[in-house]
């Protein structure tokens, strides 16, 4: 206790004293049943299966059912991850959901997921970081476990991009699909998650973006004379710009991350890049 003036002591705040290690204890995944071929995509765009495979390496993708939500997909992936981690859902102290396709501004999807899984009153929140969201979630979970805030964190990356894809847009219609991946991060005797390199490029917000803000839909809904003037706020991107950006940036970030971990590329057993498309990965 530190006195500030006679008769008025101020209590000292306490916090966890030891920095622990963390690792991924279990992984889970979910892909919807419906397989969508390039031929089906080409019904709406001027393209071909051969062109799509040549440009992206993509042969098929999965689309969720119309009544299948991001929480439904996240639940399936999470149950698998929790089972593989060998823990009870009640041991999970926090749920992090990475998604940009939960259709509600509020409430977040994470609390509903925690409730479905039988997790009693966890800290639960969504993060909106698009392609980087899952990695952001893993890093946050790692920090939470190491700091002693919680012992186990459920991290889920899930998207239902079929709801926000313009099937008539030749530049993006064949790129996106639906699915979920989950991980349980928990306490470990040895380090299991390496350093994270954070960053963003705010000057490139127009490269991959939502076509219209949600607020632009209100005039069209309230005034019939505006019908047809406002497009559904689907995701669009500048393909060539994204390709160049991803190829050069991802390679440098990988090099910098390896250096931050104080290892070399020869020490790596596997390299798992973001699954954008085969051309980017190969480049």
List each language-model region with its residue ranges.
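Flexible, glycine-rich active-site loops centered on histidine and acidic residues
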Residues: 146-180
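Condensing-enzyme catalytic core mediating Claisen C-C bond formation in acyl metabolism
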Residues: 2-66, 169-248, 252
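Buried hydrophobic positions in well-ordered alpha/beta secondary-structure cores of metabolic enzymes
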Residues: 24-26, 52, 81, 92-95, ...
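Phosphate/pyrophosphate-binding loops at sites that engage ATP/ADP/AMP, CoA/4′-phosphopantetheine
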Residues: 77-93, 252-269
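Short glycine-aspartate micro-motif
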Residues: 21-24, 94-96, 151-155
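Glycine-rich phosphate-binding loops at beta-strand->alpha-helix junctions
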Residues: 95-104, 268-283
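Acidic, glycine-rich active-site loops and adjacent beta-strand->loop/helix elements
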Residues: 30, 98-103, 129-134, 157-162, ...
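Conserved catalytic cysteine-centered active-site region
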Residues: 51-72, 100-153, 283
């Amino acid at each position: 206790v530190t006195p500030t003036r006679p008769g008025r002591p101020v209590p000292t705040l306490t916090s966890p004293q030891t920095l622990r290690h963390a690792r991924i204890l279990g992984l889970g995944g979910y892909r919807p049943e419906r397989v969508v071929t390039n031929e089906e995509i080409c019904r709406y765009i001027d393209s071909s299966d051969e062109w799509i495979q040549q440009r992206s390496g993509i042969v098929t993708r999965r689309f969720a059912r119309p009544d299948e939500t991001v929480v439904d997909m996240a639940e399936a992936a999470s149950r698998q991850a929790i089972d593989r981690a060998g823990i009870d859902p009640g041991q999970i102290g926090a749920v992090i959901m990475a998604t940009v396709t939960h259709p509600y501004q509020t409430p977040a999807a994470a609390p509903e997921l925690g409730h479905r899984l039988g997790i009693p009153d966890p800290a639960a929140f969504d993060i909106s970081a698009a392609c980087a969201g899952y990695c952001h979630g893993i890093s946050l979970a790692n920090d939470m476990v190491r700091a002693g805030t919680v012992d186990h964190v459920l991290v889920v990356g899930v998207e239902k991009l079929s709801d926000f894809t313009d099937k008539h847009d030749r530049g993006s219609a064949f790129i996106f699909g639906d699915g979920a991946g989950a991980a349980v991060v928990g306490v470990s005797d040895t380090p299991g998650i390496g350093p994270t390199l954070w960053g963003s490029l705010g000057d490139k917000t127009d490269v991959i973006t939502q076509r219209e803000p949600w607020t632009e839909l209100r005039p069209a809904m309230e005034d019939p004379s505006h019908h047809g003037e406002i497009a559904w706020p689907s995701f669009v991107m500048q393909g060539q710009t994204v390709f160049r950006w991803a190829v050069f940036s991802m390679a440098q970030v990988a090099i910098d991350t390896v250096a931050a971990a104080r290892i070399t590329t020869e020490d790596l057993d596997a390299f798992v890049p973001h699954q954008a498309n085969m051309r980017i990965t190969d480049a």
